[in-house]
Amino acid sequence: MKLCIFGGNGFVGSAIARKAVARGWSVVSVSRSGRPFATPAGHSPAWVSEVEWRKGSPFDLSTYDALLPSCDALVTTLGTLLETPYKEQGVARPLSVLKALAENATGSRGNPLAKDGRERSYERLNRDSALQLFEAFHSSRSSTAATSPSPFVFISAEDIFRPFVPARYIQTKRDAETQIWQRAAADAPAPTVRPVFVRPSLMYHPHLNPPSTLPATLLEATSNLHALIPRALHLFPSPPPSTIPNAAVPPAAASLAALFAIPPIHVDAVGEAVCASIADEQTQGVVDVARMREMLGFDALGWGLAPGRGRKAGVV
């Protein structure tokens, strides 16, 4: 298995790369800088030397077109939670996030028509980059000898951040899912690409992103309490689970309710779930937190695994 990861040196992408290397897969990372992953302290883990690090952009086909025919699967982790800068070394920092949220709330984001504003827009980073990569990967399948549909994994998100984050964030994610699904379905009855939409909730890691642990612990507690409430008493019942994406976005109140109902997830668990989805030819469509926990063997009722406790399904 040869896996291409766009954004493999970021918070999520590095977790996927590490899990893929552990499986013995060949991994190539394509990112804007082309730099290998490094911890916040500047350390380079041993697995980093097993990955090929390349510089490229989803909007510049010449930077990766020759690579795709040799890849069995592609994962894109590209996207942005906010249209103003909020990451340091690829990891969201609390103060930077709060500053960006304030700028979004007050509308002081600068000129949206400026070059940097256009390049950081939700439409470009969350939707168009994924569509561009899907089309390129789909076109490359004619040059392969694959006997089954090749996995294309889009790292999407659970709808848990509204009204704190603009609705366009999740809308562009859902638009990308829907358009990719429809494009892949158009190849029936002989599809060449198997789309998978992984939807993590709040992702945390005690060491790579220590500030994420406190909110994760709190949300773990609220999700456990929510699980004890009879479904009939939920103010905003969760929609029936479906693997087919839907571009419709529910009211913001439903998103806020989901924030307290859906447990956070360790970024390494997301990495493992992505690799499991690639390896399982039956997995396609939406893979939400509940489905990830199911495939990784987490307990279904209490959601289990509070941040920083225990090791399960390769989570450390």
Residue ranges and their predicted role:
Residues 8-11, 15-16, 146, 150, ...:
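Oxidoreductase cofactor-interface core, primarily capturing Rossmann-like NAD(P)-dependent enzymes
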